[in-house]
Regions:
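N-terminal secretory targeting and juxtamembrane "stalk" segments of secreted and cell-surface proteins
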Residues: 9-10
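Acidic, glycine-rich loop-and-strand cores that form catalytic or ligand-binding grooves
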Residues: 110, 114, 118
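A short coil-to-beta-strand element that immediately follows conserved catalytic motifs
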Residues: 117-127
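Acidic, metal-coordinating catalytic segment for phosphate/diphosphate chemistry
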Residues: 2, 16-62, 68
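Conserved Nudix-box catalytic region and its N-terminal flanking loop in Nudix hydrolases
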Residues: 55-57, 64, 70-111
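A structural signal for short, well-ordered beta-strand segments
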Residues: 61-63, 124, 142-146
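Nudix hydrolase/Nudix homology domain
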Residues: 1-3, 40, 46-48, 81-96, ...
Length: 195
């Protein structure tokens, strides 16, 4: 049996036991602190070791990108059953090449390079977790937003498996049922105007 040896950052699950379901707005951490929050406790483990391990939780970054026209970057793709679905923003696990210091910041920079040729300014919004979904229960996402001028950036739009597009708030609402679990939580945040 093939084992996926890709490594991702994890922390002990009891460290994040106070993080409830859905979205928790940040009220205490500065942007700089959010980058370093898991540095001392985070360790890198192969995915196959932690897939169903209840002792650890994977740390990921979620970046919402908004332009001056109040449009949001989405990724249109097909899921494992070949059904069309969409992801809001950029999601990625924190990987070893991100290092042990400011690993979250380094991962944000690395993941945005797949979309834009310049660095973005991030704002830390809070954390996201979906305790109702077995597929993502063991993942905790740090949520950031970056606002850009659409005219100043070249969006790398085409990929073999998906296409990057800009959606208005109304388009997000209209295609809500096609959104991934985490994207639905973030769309709820946008609709409720928490950001």
């Amino acid at each position: 049996m093939f084992k996926n040896k890709e490594q991702v950052m994890v922390v002990p699950v009891n460290y994040v036991s106070n993080v409830g379901n859905k979205f928790k707005l940040n009220e205490t951490l500065t942007l700089q602190q959010s980058y370093c929050h898991y540095d001392s406790l985070g360790v890198y483990r192969p995915l196959y070791e932690i897939e169903n391990n209840i002792c650890f939780i994977r740390i990921s970054t979620m970046l919402i990108i908004k332009n001056q026209y109040n449009e949001y970057l989405v990724k249109e793709l097909h899921d494992k059953q070949k059904r069309p679905c969409l992801e809001l923003g950029i999601h990625s696990y924190v990987k070893p090449q991100s290092g042990n210091y400011q690993a979250i910041y380094n991962q944000l920079i690395a993941s945005t390079r797949n979309y834009f040729d310049v660095d973005l300014n991030f704002e830390y919004l809070g954390t996201i977790r979906d305790l109702a979904n077995d597929n993502v229960k063991s993942i905790l996402g740090n949520v950031y937003i970056a606002e850009i001028n659409k005219n100043d950036f070249i969006l790398k739009t085409k990929h073999d498996l998906y296409e990057n597009k800009w959606y208005s708030k109304q388009e997000l609402i209209d295609k809500y049922n096609k959104a991934t679990s985490w994207s639905k939580i973030m769309i709820d945040i946008i609709v409720e105007e928490l950001i």
